[in-house]
Amino acid sequence: MNFPRPLVPATLVQRYKRFLFDAILADGTAITGSCPNTGSMRGLTIPGSPIWLSEHDSPTRKYRHMLEIVEADGTLVGINTGLPNRIAEEAIMAGQVGNLHTYGTLRREQRYGRNSRIDILLSDAEKGLAYVEVKNVHFSRVRGLAEFPDSPTQRGAKHLEELGDMVEAGHRAIMLYLIQRGDCSRFRICRELDPVYARAFERASARGVEAYAVKCAVSPGQIVAAGPIVVDEPVPAVL
């Protein structure tokens, strides 16, 4: 996924009200911009952090700048939650997510489950249907290890249950964790921050839901899928 124009470097002053941030541009100009991530962004909102911003000239936008990348401990981390589905699609087509690239048709945002939409629905005359839910991941406390979630997510647990229902209906169901950073070689569920989600993941795994994790190469010019990493989670023997 290439950015349409080069990102603008800046220094983070603060992120607040979930949707906003203040920053200082390289020329010393103080600006306020929009943050396309309503999550906790744990570890990525430290004042003084180097950041990169996209610029938007539309007269209908209240803020010209939008936060895209934060540097954390020397690693560039993508924070825009609107990008993972596009990057995940590229990863699938590049053969980085099992054999999903062999399916004949890919559709986006299809209705399923209990008033939900699946991020990616794959179909094939021989293989049938494969439901792919994509989760954005940027949390890392231990070097080389990516974790999800970084805060409680009831919606995430619901998605796992719905994927399990698809397996029981005779289809494939995949949870794809898209890690918007390149310094991780393993992924696991963060039980300490959301034990409910962890239990939902274990139940879904036992029902046959598959889990994959793909890391990204992040730069101010592009964010691209950089290959699969290990999902460090045992499959439970019982529900």
UniProtKB/Swiss-Prot annotation:
Kindly list the GO molecular function terms attached to this UniProt entry. DNA binding
- Mind telling me which Gene3D superfamilies this protein's record contains? 2.40.50.580, 3.40.1350.60
Record's family? Belongs to the SfsA family.
Can you name this protein?
Sugar fermentation stimulation protein homolog
What is the scientific name of the source organism?
Rhizobium meliloti (strain 1021)
Q: By which gene is this protein encoded?
A: sfsA
